[in-house]
Amino acid sequence: WIMGHMVNEIYQIDEFVDLGANSIETDITFDDNAMAEYSFHGVPCDCRRYCHKWEYINTFLDGLRRATTPGDSKFRKELALVVFDLKTGDLSSSTANKGGKLFGQKLLQHYWKGGNNGGRAYIILSIPDLDHYAFISGFKEALKTAGHEELLAKVGYDFSGNDDLGSTRTALNKAGVKDREHVWQSGGITNCVSTLFRGLDRVKKAVSNRDSSNGYINKVYHWTVDKYGSVRDALDAGVDGVMTNDPDVIVNVLNESKYKGKLRLATYDDNPWETFKP
């Protein structure tokens, strides 16, 4: 999976897919009432990127729906997976549940069109703080209450704070997510900082967990990877996805002889919740 990083304006969906991304990551900010408000990152953000691109969340979800709805003039068949980087820092452990409920309702209305022929992409809820696990519980509850529990088949989960894997597993379980129930595990650091500061040790541990008989992880991705050498290192470590500001760099590496016969770009027909067995 080539995961286009910080796609917060609608026009960027085409920009990143044109460069080779089959997945995008979008930042979601919340207001004082725990309601998702904007697709927006703000400062600081990755080097070589403008940090202030934004849309109102409803507008962005409508645009995303069109990009992932077959038959729509804006449809991009390559775009199969969307990571919502949920900026829950302003939520508390007690308002996280409310935030999840409200976000579930918003996705149901603006992305899934009330469950009637909405966008088809798989969705990952990526949360930076283990203490906010109740966001997931609230999200699931919102879809169940609305009578659309079936949409949870399209939803996966990630904690992005580089926490201890055992603690991450506990937080997922508390949220009602079973081991290997649509679990992606991220690991990484901003592209402004050398990967020497946070190498691939944690990513390799996550890959080992994914491949063990008693792990909790389905897929592992590394962020934010823009340099050719770092991409090769991540692929050699066995990741399933690479989050990047430069999707074309990943495409070029995948076309190198070392990887060409071994790895390919995922399509919509590849289930992102199934652990890949080469």
Swiss-Prot record:
- According to its UniProt record, the EC number is 4.6.1.-
GO BP annotations, alphabetical order: killing of cells of another organism; lipid catabolic process
What does the entry's cofactor note say about binding and number?
Binds 1 Mg(2+) ion per subunit.
Which Gene3D superfamilies does the record associate with it? Phosphatidylinositol (PI) phosphodiesterase
Chief place where the protein resides? secreted
An example GO CC term for this entry is: extracellular region
Cysteines engaged in disulfide bonds, as pairs: C45-C51, C47-C192
Tissue specificity note: Expressed by the venom gland.
**Catalysed reaction, written as an equation:** an N-(acyl)-sphingosylphosphocholine = an N-(acyl)-sphingosyl-1,3-cyclic phosphate + choline; an N-(acyl)-sphingosylphosphoethanolamine = an N-(acyl)-sphingosyl-1,3-cyclic phosphate + ethanolamine; a 1-acyl-sn-glycero-3-phosphocholine = a 1-acyl-sn-glycero-2,3-cyclic phosphate + choline; a 1-acyl-sn-glycero-3-phosphoethanolamine = a 1-acyl-sn-glycero-2,3-cyclic phosphate + ethanolamine
What GO MF annotations does this protein's record show?
Answer: lyase activity; metal ion binding; phosphoric diester hydrolase activity; toxin activity
Q: Which residues bind Mg(2+)?
A: E25, D27, D85
Q: Which UniProt keywords apply?
A: Cytolysis, Dermonecrotic toxin, Disulfide bond, Hemolysis, Lipid degradation, Lipid metabolism, Lyase, Magnesium, Metal-binding, Secreted, Toxin
What does the UniProt entry say about where the protein is found? Secreted
**Which residues does the Swiss-Prot or TrEMBL record annotate as the active site?**
H5, H41 (nucleophile)
Which top-rank group of organisms is this from? Eukaryota
Q: Which cofactor does it need?
A: Mg(2+)
> Which family, according to the similarity comment?
Belongs to the arthropod phospholipase D family. Class II subfamily.
User: What does this protein do, in the record's words?
Assistant: Dermonecrotic toxins cleave the phosphodiester linkage between the phosphate and headgroup of certain phospholipids (sphingolipid and lysolipid substrates), forming an alcohol (often choline) and a cyclic phosphate. This toxin acts on sphingomyelin (SM). It may also act on ceramide phosphoethanolamine (CPE), lysophosphatidylcholine (LPC) and lysophosphatidylethanolamine (LPE), but not on lysophosphatidylserine (LPS), and lysophosphatidylglycerol (LPG). It acts by transphosphatidylation, releasing exclusively cyclic phosphate products as second products.
What's the protein here called? Answer: Dermonecrotic toxin LhSicTox-alphaIV1iii
